Structure formats: structure tokens, C-alpha cells
């Protein structure tokens, strides 16, 4: 934006977008430093690392420094994109914008008058910058969520493929043979059970017939007609 029309316009209004951007970036870096200072204190407390244990303390510091470096690398890339976007779109002067004449400008500064319309535009510009900043945070959160979801899907797919490899064609043949064998054994068991039941039924009938024969022998001598009819009915049931 250096040497451009936009720079001249902002200079005429005693504004410097680059200073605003630098202050925003410095604020982000300050927040990161404070966050990692708190993280270092809390980690030492949670891990019960005392100041006298220099080896563990140094290992913790090295680990935190590495994580901080990775995080700052990502944040720096994001802030560079945000800075480029802001300078290109948010601080771009619209086509047709005309600077006031020097005499008019000096008279305005001398009289201490302010252009209300320009103040409204500046307020609108600040609001847009806030919206862009919030949207940038939301996009970062969405990107992290997508990355976590992608890792989870890849892991699930890998587990499914490993499970499918266990059930190849040879395994299915073995399972089918085992099921056929079990079905044959079950059929043979059912047939043996039916045979035992038939033998038991026939044995019971023979036993009943013998018992009725004895009763009939006794009836032939002193039995009544009703007893004979009852015996005949029992034989018919058999």
C-alpha cells in the first residue's frame, strides 16, 4: 500500500492502517505469551516438578518451547493472510474517492471541524475489521474440526479394512464347512431322539397290552359285561 492512493488518503486523515495491523498482531503475540506462561506454571504444578529438579524442568521447558514454536508458525501464517486481506480490501479506497483540496483541508484543520460522514465510514470500517477478525477465528476452529474429523474417518476406514482382511475367501469356506458339519450332527441327533421316543412308545403299548391281557384273563371267570366293553375300548385306543 506504500506510495499508493490509499496511503495518501489515510495520511491526509492522520491514519495509518499498517500501525493498526501491527498493534493487532502484537496483541495476539502477547496473548500467546501469557497463555504459554500460564501453561508452563500449570504443567509444573500438575507434574509436581520442583525447581531443584533441573533435568525435568529443562525437559518440560523444551517441550513447551517446541509446542509454542509450532503454534506460532501456524498463527504467523494466518496473520499474514489476514494482514494481506485487510490491506487489500478493508483499507482500500473506493474508486472515485477524491481528496479535499489543500486549502479546504487546511481550513478544516484550522477550524477543528470534523466530517461526520467520514467518522461514520471509519466506524463502519472498524466494525468490518472486527467481523473479519471473528470470522478468521471461526474459520480456524472449523479447519481444526475438519482435520480431527478426517483423522477419525481414516482410522475407522483402516479398522474396517483390517477386519475385512480377516474374512477372506478361505475363511468363509472353512466357516461354511463347519456350519454344514454342525447341521449334519444336529440332524443325526434329532433322528436318534425320534427313534428313542418311538421305541419308548412301543414299549409302553406292549406293557399296557400285557396288563390288559392279565385283566381280561381275570374277567373271563367272574367279569361283568361292562368290564369287557371297557377292555375292548382300551384295545381300540391302542
Swiss-Prot record:
Disruption phenotype: Embryonic lethality when homozygous. GO terms for biological process: cell division; meiotic cell cycle; mitotic cell cycle. Signal peptide: none annotated. Pfam families: Mis12. InterPro entries: Centromere_Mis12. Keywords: Cell cycle, Cell division, Centromere, Chromosome, Coiled coil, Kinetochore, Meiosis, Mitosis. Residues 117-149 form a coiled coil. GO terms for cellular component: chromosome, centromeric region; MIS12/MIND type complex; nucleus. It is found in: Chromosome, Centromere, Kinetochore. Its main location: nucleus. It comes from the Eukaryota. Belongs to the mis12 family. PANTHER family: PROTEIN MIS12 HOMOLOG (PTHR14527:SF2). Constitutive component of kinetochores that is essential for proper cell division during mitotic cell cycle. May play a role in the modulation of centromere during meiosis. This is Protein MIS12 homolog. It comes from Arabidopsis thaliana. The lineage of its organism: Eukaryota, Viridiplantae, Streptophyta, Embryophyta, Tracheophyta.
